[in-house]
Amino acid sequence: LRVNAGHSALDLPTGSLALKFTRRTFINGAMLGAGAIFASSSFAKVAPESVVKPAPTKDGKSTLTPDEALALLVEGNHAFLRDELRVPDLSAARRLSLAAGQAPFCAYVTCSDSRVPPELLFGRGLGELFIIRNAGNTVDTVAMGSIEYAVAELGVPLVVVLGHEACGAVKAAMSVVEKNARFPGAIDNMIEPIIPAVLEARSQPGDPIENAVKQNVRRVVEVLRKESDPIMLRPQQENRLKVIGAYYHLDSGRVDFFDRV
């Protein structure tokens, strides 16, 4: 085999170690080159202004007001709708700082649906959203304790209850009401808290599933505003905490915030 080496040519016997080395070097070099091109083209898409800095904190707590926290979420969702690439701080330094403690600015009660990823919807990064998830975004003892922990111990200024378009748990609750459907295992018990919202939404005009999802959100918001422990109620009375509802449109990516106070 004849191989060009710079300006000269070498005759290498077939199967020789030198030939294997040459092939390996060529293949590895090609792979590295392709990787470099891919990496450079990928990172070229990340404009400096797209890198999202973590929300401000002081003494291990968020310094944002409830309205400032909500404004960050609204801004992030608008960027998501515009297909803007927003890169949060994922550096080793950021990870190391979070190992010492977290200071989220929002507690999120949302559905377990895989199509509803809060950090992506709002362009936020590590340690910024304290997320409580279950099918149907309901609040049982475990969820309530998690929310109260986020408020009392972590000092979040905002709690958002997020329902979404075409929620399977709400559809299941509707089938119980309309068809007396039954589900195996613990699913029946899981959707039971959603049934009152389905019943209340039946008389509302418009899409019955969307109405039921929003009514379910409103019921949870009402509980968190009025029927929870003083550790939740006191910061709301002192305007250090807000609890609001939201609805996510799967098809467009838009999040509508409602029942604001």
Role assignments for model-derived ranges:
Residues 114-115, 164-169:
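Gly/Ser/Thr-rich loops at beta-strand to alpha-helix junctions
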Residues 109-111, 133, 160-164, 244-249:
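Short beta-strand segments
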Residues 112-137, 142:
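Active-site cofactor/substrate anionic-group-binding motifs, chiefly glycine-
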Residues 19-27, 41:
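Twin-arginine (Tat) signal peptide motif
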Residues 93-106, 111-116:
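Glycine-rich, flexible N-terminal cofactor/catalytic loop recognition
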Residues 1-21:
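N-terminal secretory signal peptides
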